[in-house]
Swiss-Prot record:
Homodimerizes, then multimerizes. Interacts with cytosol exposed regions of viral L glycoprotein present in the reticulum-to-Golgi compartment. Interacts with human FLNB. Phosphorylated form interacts with host importin alpha; this interaction depends on the exposure of the NLS, which itself depends upon genome maturation and/or phosphorylation of the capsid protein. Interacts with host NUP153. Residues 155-177 are annotated as: 3 X 8 AA repeats of S-P-R-R-R-[PR]-S-Q. It comes from Hepatitis B virus genotype H subtype adw4 (isolate Nicaragua/2928Nic/1997). It is found in: Virion; Host cytoplasm. Phosphorylated by host SRPK1, SRPK2, and maybe protein kinase C or GAPDH. Phosphorylation is critical for pregenomic RNA packaging. Protein kinase C phosphorylation is stimulated by HBx protein and may play a role in transport of the viral genome to the nucleus at the late step during the viral replication cycle. The modification Phosphoserine is found at S162, S170. This is Capsid protein. Pfam families: Hepatitis_core. Keywords: Capsid protein, Cytoplasmic inwards viral transport, DNA-binding, Host cytoplasm, Host-virus interaction, Microtubular inwards viral transport, Phosphoprotein, Repeat, RNA-binding, T=4 icosahedral capsid protein, Viral penetration into host nucleus, Virion, Virus entry into host cell. GO terms for cellular component: host cell; host cell cytoplasm; T=4 icosahedral viral capsid. Self assembles to form an icosahedral capsid. Most capsids appear to be large particles with an icosahedral symmetry of T=4 and consist of 240 copies of capsid protein, though a fraction forms smaller T=3 particles consisting of 180 capsid proteins. Entering capsids are transported along microtubules to the nucleus. Phosphorylation of the capsid is thought to induce exposure of nuclear localization signal in the C-terminal portion of the capsid protein that allows binding to the nuclear pore complex via the importin (karyopherin-) alpha and beta.
Amino acid sequence: MDIDPYKEFGASVELLSFLPSDFFPSVRDLLDTASALYRDALESPEHCTPNHTALRQAILCWGELMTLASWVGNNLEDPAARDLVVNYVNTNMGLKIRQLLWFHISCLTFGRDTVLEYLVSFGVWIRTPPAYRPPNAPILSTLPETTVVRQRGRAPRRRTPSPRRRRSQSPRRRRSQSPASQC
């Protein structure tokens, strides 16, 4: 079976493969981040989002993998074989878990569309020959200049006043928002 854990989120294993392995923080750092930012949602019996569910599953898989690693460490007598198993788990499984954790934490933090746009931008950047690309790689925490961040249900503000209307000299009154519109 060819199962891609990112497919339902609009990404793919191939898209994440453009990011170098040292790009991803350690599992410990990612688990600490997930706990600090999303502990309540992850521990809640309520369903939040598919990203929360996938993050829960990745955390549970890592826990099971660590249980297996402890068992191997305690029960495998041959040190060379034990080292092979530990190195394989850290190199292959560790990277996959780090990618999964990073992807879902980033989607929850920055939004799925921003993360997907970042992955595509980075993929284009890394495949462009060095002589023809900007010196710095795209950065996820920097929103693209074209992104407009505003509350739902409000019309975009004009940047300049209409030439037909004079600006009032008195300060503008702010409309109070209803509690329902703050979600």
